[in-house]
From Swiss-Prot:
This is Arginine--tRNA ligase. PANTHER family: ARGININE--TRNA LIGASE, CYTOPLASMIC, ARGINYL-TRNA SYNTHETASE. Its EC number is 6.1.1.19. It comes from Listeria monocytogenes serotype 4b (strain F2365). It catalyses: tRNA(Arg) + L-arginine + ATP = L-arginyl-tRNA(Arg) + AMP + diphosphate. SMART domains: Arg_tRNA_synt_N, DALR_1. One of its GO terms (biological process) is arginyl-tRNA aminoacylation. Belongs to the class-I aminoacyl-tRNA synthetase family. It is found in: Cytoplasm. A motif ('HIGH' region) lies at residues 132-142. It holds the Pfam family DALR_1.
Amino acid sequence: MNVMQENQIKLIEHIKQAVVQAVGLEEAEVPEILLEVPKDKKHGDYSTNIAMQLARVAKKAPRQIAESIVPELKKDNKLIKEVEIAGPGFINFYLDNAYLTDLVPVILTEDKQYGESDFGKGEKFQIEFVSANPTGDLHLGHARGAAIGDSLANIMKMAGFDVSREYYINDAGNQINNLVLSAEARYFEALGLDSEFPEDGYRGADIISLGKDLAAKYGDKYVHTSEEERRSVFRVDALAFETGKLRADLEEFRVSFDEWFSETSLYEENKVLPALERLRENGYIYEQDGATWLRTTDFEDDKDRVLIKSDGSYTYFLPDIAYHLNKLERGFDVLIDIWGADHHGYIPRMRAAIEALGYSPNQLEVEIIQLVHLFEDGVQVKMSKRTGKSVTMRDLIEEVGLDATRYFFAMRSSDTHMNFDMSLAKSTSNDNPVYYVQYAHARISSILRSGKEQGLEVTKDADMSLLQTEAEYDLLKVLGEFADVVAEAATKRAPHRIVRYLNDLASSFHRFYNSNKVLDMDNLEVTKARLALIKTAQITLRNGLTLLGVSAPEKM
């Protein structure tokens, strides 16, 4: 718990005691006291609506109640500088800013751990994201999902949740058969033999390369073997080739997974039919028209869903149910699935299946990744200049850089359509959000280097009481909000709140820097305090950028 949180608790307790004295309630009768940070600093550091909450109990107007509470609030509290009543009965608090300087040694000590909390209390979450078919390159939707999923996992972990990242490999569907047939055709082609290319095959350059690899590895060994034997071998090689590309691209994007879960393993380990039997035992399966159905309408789905078709083949829904049952049986409290925009209609049926299995539907959360449109110089970009095909994640990283790609994808809520401005992402100006934040970090690093060259090291023993200007206090207030912002971003599943915070922090630092001289050799004690202050800003900027998978450069 940091200084800001401790003072919030002290303030809430002080308000409670004031209510007891002014209104005549027992402590247990006082409703929950909520503190809000006013958007306009003119309205104080904190505000509470407790007087409005008490109106019915006290049988008085909220403002009249507030007027009775305020005198009690002003008694014996060094934390509060001023209290005022606003509007119909809001109580605004102006705190004595001197307490803020206690933050500096705390942040310096916690360093990379600054921002961590036990807010999540170790609750076990699994976040499954990206999960692209292993049949080609990652597109922009996958890239946005990767950035948001990884950032969310980082944020929730810092907020005290136990988080596992998982990639579901769709390696059991018809698309894999097409991949194998495509690889087979390119294998024959690489050996100079005629082969009919499958109608729905994959024609990318990567499959041509795979065919050459197979020819180099096996020669003509599989030319005359049975189709079954050849395709069984090529299936393993093709999947290894494609998943290897996915892993490499994601690792370059600074995204890693704790588990790569194969759909095929559900069949190999007999996980599918037991899931069906559990649904049957729970009374939600019926047979109709030769097919096997799940009665999802019992759980607010708009129609029942087929699990096994009349020809005996499974729909996609059945293995998906088995997979989610497997996740829950692994002990996760909550599952977060991050899906593409085209899966929005899939949510009600999957939540229904979770409930039909005997779990709470609230144990499944789904975050939808909306579409991404690229723009450059105001013109929409649909094709890669390099390949003449759809722009891939790899293309975008090469064009605007890894940091800009990660940061820009985290800037907007995942459920909003995104226009990605490539020109802005490449610009080296303060209009570029990621440049603006990284430049603040680099500028601080430069000042600290200059101080070190003059024999001035950052120390926790500096006299922090010398930090007294409004810009210093404003910067400290923003620094003190970091852990709360992380917890809020975790709770709301909203990485974009970290982006917003970093922009606010960079702005606060730049305002401080423009109005306060840091390196003043004629005033060494103030200089030492300000060096310590900007070091805390550097630490917090770095920690926030790290959550988003973005680097914190020392020089720019």
